[in-house]
Amino acid sequence: MLDGELNRWFLDPLLRGTYPHDVLERHAPNAPPVRDGDMALITAPIDFLGVNYYQRRVVAGTADGGWRTVHQDDSQHTDMGWEVSPDGLRDLLVRLHDDYAPPPIVITENGAAFGDA
């Protein structure tokens, strides 16, 4: 569900022309209305897809249908507690390519917080 709310909620309408059904069902009472003409505007061609990436997030489901972050003890972490996982950006870019075949991708933000910087 977290993937739907943080990723697919934004990418699916832009690159597929529809909102993810699982997220819509979960949030139906609070979902914004989609009016005539909205999807035509949302799916207008874009020159590039900007990606802001700082860390991967490993999660597990909870009994109430929510999620919790699973701390990766065997990984290096920044001073802010973010896991250092260089493969995460690569995995994201591969997923975007495989799932969406987007226009050119521009890494618009990334980085980490360390005490010496």
What do these predicted ranges mean?
Residues M1-A117:
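Active-site region of glycoside hydrolase catalytic domains
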